[in-house]
């Protein structure tokens, strides 16, 4: 027979206590008001000796061992069955001994087995033992009644205990967070020291999250703040380090998904994720995103991080070398903005294994700042049009005649002499490079006769890398873009060749081609303007990349989005909110902005508080940037020159924040821009006159 808890040894040491089983039975009978409990009745189910004297000399270890086995946790139904005879005998023995022994003697004998009786009674309360009917029907009814009463009492006790566990305190939550942090820190130390494999480590981490506040299934009645909880920030960092650096291989995709989902429910339990943020019931797995560092972000280490990046931009570029377009972006990363922590994103066009090793070295630099590397790079937002897509099919069956409506892949103004901002733009001779018309600037000459010739002039502005060329010093500019129109014309011509001559489809394509030719000829006869100045250079550690175009006097220039542009997702961009009325010099971190580019159209985002540092043209540069929100796309090729705008809060209209010049070419979620204040300051330094977005008033 298998022995539990060393009971057999205990019997040999205290063999003189021969009356213990009977006294134990007497105590159980008295606590249930002289009714025999069904569980306590299991003390000696295998006894076949009806002599009470023999019962007193029975092996105590055998008695308790049988009781434990009769309520085995390995039984599927957690119920065992005994013979009616054994039950009757045990009941008879209990009644016999209860009348022949005193309560004091019973208490004395129970002290030796006090640590044994408690586990047995606990098992009895949780797992009732169902018996077969014995010959003594009355005894069976008494046992059943007593068992029901005992179970009801124990059930209420468990319910009250569960209710008390749910009433957790804030101190207990912080203690649990601290314990979880310590466990995860130990796991991460083992990983970095090659003590444990990543596969085993992530399994242990998932189990630790499962054990966090196990009695609380729903949200806690408190709100935990990342700013005030160092343990929570460190936990977030470790999880993000798993997801962004250690589990990036496709072999860990399943482990990554499980950990991310467990982390999501962990944050939801702490009220860092609300139902409005994500709907978990939809079955869609949450994902990590990047967010801007706004004005309300008070996370520790933020000031220190900004100082490091500022010092980095002041370093001598001659002693630094990196991949073209590589960058360092300070952002927030997490599932939602409220659950995100400070993050340094390293973008590299050619990502290699040693870069991940570098992250391991930098891991301990900040205790609560996440670092990760990704394949990405900064590139100019001008578009280089490639080859025209072709089809393999020779012909297409004709369809019924209908009136065709073509929609060109660029904005077209209703009035060719009134061109709104944000239209496509290129030089007259460009074959590939195209960008966006940012807007219009007007010189404020005042009464100075030296600049009187410019008093009534209008100037368009865009990025210098879009319109400057080594072949021509002062190129003419076309709006819409000559590059896009020519490319569109080639596509239509190629597509028309797939239809038979005289068909309605081919006729429609050729008519559209003819309209494009007419528009191109009109633009060459009515030139939009000519580049008069531009530069792409590093001035005071900042990129100066813009050019001004003197617009032909026959064109009416207004800083408005125009009614002829494509519809916007924002329904408030109508009427007065189509006009740019103010320059924004004081940029507030987290400010909601948008741009309308010739390539991607309307996209929105938020201003980041800390600049992005990147390597381009053999120099280390920095720039303000926008983080896309709520969609993960902000800019792409062809958007260079687009103005960064925001809706004014105190009046109707739009505010001008800056001009887009670059973006991250791989993920396209960052938009780098030059503030309008820097542009106007540089123009004043070069031209010696003031500039504004509104025409100069007479007098």
Swiss-Prot record:
Post-translational modification: The propeptide is autoproteolytically cleaved from the catalytic domain but remains associated, forming an inactive protease complex. This processing occurs even in the absence of signaling.
Active site residues of this protein: 465 (charge relay system), 545 (charge relay system), 640 (charge relay system)
One cellular component (GO) term of this entry: plasma membrane
Main localisation: membrane
Name this protein carries in UniProt: SPS-sensor serine protease component SSY5
Ranges for region Disordered: 1-113, 129-158
Description of what induces expression: Down-regulated after extracellular amino-acid addition.
Entry similarity comment: Belongs to the peptidase S64 family.
Subunit structure comment from the entry: Component of the plasma membrane SPS (SSY1-PTR3-SSY5) amino acid sensor complex.
Compositional bias (Low complexity): 61-78, 144-154
Keyword Protein biosynthesis set for record: no
Pfam families cross-referenced by the UniProt entry: Peptidase_S64
Entry membrane topology: Peripheral membrane protein
Residues excised as propeptide: 1-381
Biased composition (Basic and acidic residues): 8-18, 39-51
Compartmental location: Cell membrane
Bias type Polar residues, positions: 24-38, 83-93
Organism encoding this protein: Saccharomyces cerevisiae (strain AWRI1631) (Baker's yeast)
Keyword match Membrane: yes
Alphabetically ordered keywords of this record: Cell membrane, Membrane, Zymogen
SUPFAM superfamilies: Trypsin-like serine proteases
Functional description taken from the UniProt entry: Protease component of the SPS-sensor system, which regulates the expression of several amino acid-metabolizing enzymes and amino acid- and peptide-permeases in response to extracellular amino acid levels by controlling the activity of two transcription factors, STP1 and STP2. Catalyzes the activation of these transcription factors, which are synthesized as latent cytoplasmic precursors, by proteolytic removal of an N-terminal inhibitory domain containing cytoplasmic retention motifs. SSY5 binds as an inactive protease complex to STP1.
Stretches the record annotates as Serine protease: 459-699
